[in-house]
């Protein structure tokens, strides 16, 4: 199975992302429900501009983060580590992403928080269900996939 396809299928079944930003040597992490766009290889999240992580992100910033399940045994561990860039969406781009996000999370219709995109540039997917320590790596710029 193609690496990005396997990663995308797993991410579509999850819903919480943790991402971290840094500014002037200070680190901060946050969690949010996400919508994953497999075509753009990006997460869409809602978060208020007044939050510490949004303030540190500014209009765009480098990010790293994870998505993981909560298995009860090591043999079932699956999770993603990633790096990329976060940016606040504006205008039509924001409107389209919000509509898709609201379809996945209808309760979000009540929120006015801005929409942000986390564009993934590198993904490492650990899937112990395929064998202990099995890792798949995807890199945006090189088109590289490693199993």
Curated annotation (Swiss-Prot):
Stretches assigned to coiled coil: none
InterPro entries: Split_barrel_FMN-bd, UPF0306
Gene3D superfamilies associated with the record: Electron Transport, Fmn-binding Protein, Chain A (2.30.110.10)
Protein family per UniProt: Belongs to the UPF0306 family.
Protein name: UPF0306 protein YhbP
UniProt lineage: Bacteria, Pseudomonadati, Pseudomonadota, Gammaproteobacteria, Enterobacterales
């Amino acid at each position: 199975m193609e690496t990005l396809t396997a990663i995308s299928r797993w991410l579509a079944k999850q819903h919480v992302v943790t991402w971290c930003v840094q500014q002037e040597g200070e680190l901060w992490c946050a969690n949010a429900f996400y919508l994953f766009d497999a075509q753009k290889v990006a997460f869409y999240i809602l978060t208020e501009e007044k939050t510490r992580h949004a303030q540190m992100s500014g209009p765009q910033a480098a990010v790293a983060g994870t998505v993981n399940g909560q298995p009860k045994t090591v043999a079932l561990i699956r999770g993603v580590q990633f790096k990329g860039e976060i940016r606040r969406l504006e205008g039509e781009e924001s409107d389209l992403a919000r509509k898709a996000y609201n379809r996945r999370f209808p309760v979000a219709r009540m929120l006015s928080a801005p929409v942000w995109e986390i564009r993934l540039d590198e993904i490492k997917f650990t899937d112990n269900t395929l064998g202990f320590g099995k890792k798949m790596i995807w890199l945006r710029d090189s088109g590289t996939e490693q199993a």
